């Protein structure tokens, strides 16, 4: 009798199959991400989850779609938002004091200028659609794939556009892992006053993903890795105000156009800030914080798997070369423009 009751449970019938599939993909990619060779490349579970999700989605998923789609959509939407909220347990306000005013200013200037350059090049030069440009801009400016995922509910982009943006920021963020260690001796030769700690701030303020920042900083020096991670987490903290500003822009546009289409207010972004503020009080034991961090990583990985499952190769091919070209141009700006911002701020404010 219990089995019959369980099988008729709406949650089991509607959502559980898709959630289990996303959970299976997340588990596999989490294990693969721990392989030393993969970890050195900075390929985290989020990146691997969308890759495996796309492979499964374009091969064996079709016969399962009818049974799994509701759970997959739940993972892509609700679990994503919850994962972003729990991401707040990764940061504290104390990290702002660790990098100082100059570090905060560098992150703000780099983020805003990078997003502006992305919009300028993407819309004016390459004539790409606004959703793709904004997603690539968010991923390049803030925290890679996680920022792309967090921006998607605000701009309501198609899964294929999200996948293209993720692929773009992952590609050039991975290249940065190999380029930045080579850049350090060159920068030190031309600018002898630049310290390993300052180069770490440059690394954290310009490389896309947290895992990529860790990998690049670790390849240079311990002090570089430490300052890079702090600068990067401060950059992650700017995700919430970025999403709120983006939502405000869309709301203003809609009011001017008298559109009936609703704009989603990113409540999860506010909750992200609340969680970060709460985490700054250090009321929870470290074990609990680690548990919430792990749960948030699992939820985001499941959301990425769901995104991959709903992305089709035909849609990726239709995107063409322009998103990759935009990613390359923005990466160039991050290195050169971001480097210039770092030098000027550290010269006159630090």
Language model features with spans:
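Structural signature of hydrophobic alpha-helical transmembrane segments
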Residues: 39-55, 77, 99-113, 137-140, ...
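Small-residue-rich segments of transmembrane alpha-helices in multi-pass membrane proteins
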Residues: 22-27, 51-53, 76-88, 110, ...
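Alpha-helical membrane segments and immediately flanking helix-loop junctions
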Residues: 128-176, 196-221, 295
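Oxyanion-binding "anion nests"
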Residues: 217-258
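Entry/N-cap segments of selected transmembrane alpha helices
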Residues: 19-21, 74-76, 82, 87, ...
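Helix-coil boundary and interhelical linker segments in multi-pass alpha-helical membrane proteins
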Residues: 34-36, 93-102, 185-198, 218-227, ...
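Structural signature of multi-pass alpha-helical membrane transport proteins
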Residues: 2-74, 87-95, 241-297, 303-315, ...
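Cytoplasmic-side transmembrane-helix entry/capping segments in multi-pass membrane proteins
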Residues: 15-19, 68-82, 104-105, 129-140, ...
């Amino acid at each position: 009798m219990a089995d019959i009751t369980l099988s008729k449970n709406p949650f089991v019938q509607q959502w559980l199959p898709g959630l289990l599939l996303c959970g299976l993909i997340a588990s596999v990619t989490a294990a693969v991400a721990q392989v030393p060779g993969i970890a050195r490349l900075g390929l985290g579970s989020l990146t691997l989850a969308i890759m495996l999700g796309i492979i499964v989605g374009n091969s064996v998923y079709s016969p399962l779609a009818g049974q799994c789609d509701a759970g997959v959509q739940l993972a892509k939407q609700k679990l994503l938002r919850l994962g972003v909220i729990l991401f707040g347990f990764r940061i504290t306000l104390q990290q702002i004091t660790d990098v100082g005013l100059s570090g905060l200013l560098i992150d703000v200037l780099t983020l805003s200028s990078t997003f502006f350059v992305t919009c300028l090049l993407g819309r004016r030069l390459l004539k790409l659609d606004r959703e793709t440009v904004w997603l690539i801009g968010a991923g390049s400016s803030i925290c890679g794939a996680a920022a792309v995922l967090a921006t998607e509910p605000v701009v309501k982009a198609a899964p294929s556009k999200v996948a293209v943006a993720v692929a773009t920021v992952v590609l050039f963020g991975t290249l940065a892992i190999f380029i930045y260690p080579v850049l350090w001796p060159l920068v030190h030769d031309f600018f002898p006053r630049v310290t390993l700690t300052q180069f770490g701030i440059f690394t954290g303020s310009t490389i896309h993903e947290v895992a990529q920042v860790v990998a690049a900083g670790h390849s240079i020096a311990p002090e570089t890795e430490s300052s890079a991670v702090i600068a990067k987490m401060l950059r992650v903290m700017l995700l919430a105000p970025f999403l709120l500003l983006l939502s405000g822009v869309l709301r203003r546009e809609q009011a001017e156009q008298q559109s009936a289409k609703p704009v989603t207010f990113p409540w999860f972004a506010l909750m992200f800030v609340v969680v970060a503020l709460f985490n700054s009080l250090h009321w929870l034991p470290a074990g609990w914080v680690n548990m919430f961090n792990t749960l948030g990583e699992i939820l985001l990985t499941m959301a990425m798997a769901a995104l991959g499952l709903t992305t089709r190769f035909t849609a990726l091919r239709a995107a063409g070369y322009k998103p990759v070209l935009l990613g390359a141009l923005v990466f160039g700006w991050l290195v050169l423009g971001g480097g210039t911002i770092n030098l000027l701020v550290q010269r006159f404010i630090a």
